[in-house]
Each structure stands twice: as structure tokens, then as C-alpha cells.
Amino acid sequence: MGMRMMVTVFPLVVLATTVVSLRSNRASDGRRGIVNKLNDLVPKYWTECCGRIGPHCSRCICPGVVCPKRG
């Protein structure tokens, strides 16, 4: 019975992983499109980094990166 369950569960895990991967790729493409539209309005102002969009330099909004202070 254990082997039979493993044979059933494995394809489900592979399918779920594939769906999640495809969704994240599509989301990234959507964000890129939004950034491009915003850059048409205000060039070089909007950036995407780590799944977020904002009016910051892309390195500053990534975790683990210290943003340089403006004087």
C-alpha cells in the first residue's frame, strides 16, 4: 500500500510544481509590463526588484542590500 500511494503522490507533486513555476513566470512578465508603462510616463523612475515595483533604485529595495544615503 505504501508504494501505491507514493506512485500516486509523485505525479501530483510534479504537476503542482509546474503550475507554480508557470504562474510565477507570468506574474513576472506582468510586472515588467507595468514597469515599462510607468517608465513611459516618468522615464527611469520606476523599477522592479525582488517582486516589488516602486520609485526606488532597484538595489535599495532588495533584502540584504544597504541603500546609500542621499545628502
From Swiss-Prot:
Regions crossing the membrane: none
Name of the molecule in the record: Conotoxin Bu25
Expression tissues: Expressed by the venom duct.
Key words of the record: Amidation, Disulfide bond, Ion channel impairing toxin, Neurotoxin, Secreted, Signal, Toxin
Family per record: Belongs to the conotoxin A superfamily.
Signal sequence residues: 1-21
Tree of life domain: Eukaryota
Single GO term (MF): acetylcholine receptor inhibitor activity
In-chain residues carrying the UniProt-annotated modification Arginine amide: 70
Posttranslational modification: Contains 3 disulfide bonds. They are not indicated here, since framework IV presents two different connectivities (I-V, II-III, IV-VI and I-III, II-V, IV-VI).
Keyword Aminoacyl-tRNA synthetase: no
GO cellular component: extracellular region
Domain comment as written in the entry: The cysteine framework is IV (CC-C-C-C-C).
Localization per record: Secreted
Pro-peptide positions on chain: 22-44
Keyword Secreted assigned: yes
